[in-house]
Amino acid sequence: LGDVYKRQDQGTVYTSSCSSDGVALFNVEYGYYTVAVHYQSASGIIFSGRLESLSLLPEQGEEVMKVQLQLARSKINALVIKEIYYVGCKGELGADYQADQYVTLYNNSDETVYLDGLCLALVDPMPGIVSPWVKYTDMKRIPVADMTWQFPGSGKEYPLLPGAETTIATNAVDHTGGEYQHANSVDLSKVDWGFWHVSLSKQNIVPGVKPLNLLLNLNSTAWMYSFPVVGPTFMIFGFEGISAEEYVNNPLNRENRSQASNKTKFYLMIPKEWVIDCAECVENEAKLANKRVPDELNHEPVYIPEGDYSGKSLIRKSAASTNGRFIYQDTNNAAEDFIVSKPSLKK
């Protein structure tokens, strides 16, 4: 096991490896710390834990302090989020532009993955606030923010071969040409899929791009679908042992935000065991504590230092190559698994 102490007021990071009995020793300065532990076995099982706020103050003396972390268990995924471009860019005449967002999924295994029936969604809430779900619930179920999107297909219509990827755009058009002319943007007219539905009047898609199914929309006033530029938490999941329609239409699978004043606003709740992969993003370093999901889904959020509308993307690190097929790093820790880069679709 590897442990990390990070001083919150200065950003100083201390690292150490655990002994055979799971003990890591640190000699650190007084301050306020975030403590994290992570281990990945050869079989692909991941153990991780995190303590958000640990105070080490002079009045506590210089005696050794013992800190115990509860570990969460997870596993490496076959289907991973390879890239997520959400911050937007500076559009024509320097205006903020975010209609060009997309996410890319990748088959990180040596077996064919079928997309049929799998779902994509954002996790509630946006990262600017402390999650009431994390604060007040056990997080055994993950709240979906408004819309749940699903790949069509009856089971084996949409294969994704080992080392293959597929991209889904919020607006599947060429944002650099035609009526758009945003030179800093990307051409999304040739992607595979689009987040598009006839009820969303501001979504755009070109012929040849397949629309996902809008499985459920719990925001009847929405006229578009976009990722928050301040950092989305994006997840892939699949239904197990029940049809998608039966599950989403059961009122027992919808909840209010804990402690919320609005009792008419509901969110679809997904068992955390159904989540295949998750990318947890926040706006900046100051928001890293605003987690949306438990550690077994993602250990630490990631952010783009250049900020909103910077034209930057988050791309998963390549860990190895086998017979010409890239294998991407997947430790369920977005802060370690992704790097900031220009969008892969940017010419």
Language-model-derived ranges and their functions:
Residues 1-5:
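Short, small-residue-biased leader/transition segments that mark boundaries at the very start
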Residues 9-11, 46-51, 132-155:
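Short beta-strand and strand-turn-strand segments in soluble, beta-rich domains
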Residues 12, 41-66, 70:
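Structured interaction patches on ligand/partner-binding surfaces of diverse proteins
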Residues 19-28:
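Short, surface-exposed beta-strand/beta-hairpin micro-motifs centered on an aromatic residue
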Residues 28-44:
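A short, solvent-exposed beta-strand micro-motif common in secreted/extracellular proteins
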Residues 71-127, 210, 219-231, 241-253, ...:
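A structural motif detector for short, solvent-exposed N-terminal "entry" segments of globular domains
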Residues 140-337, 341-346:
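Solvent-exposed beta-edge/loop recognition patches
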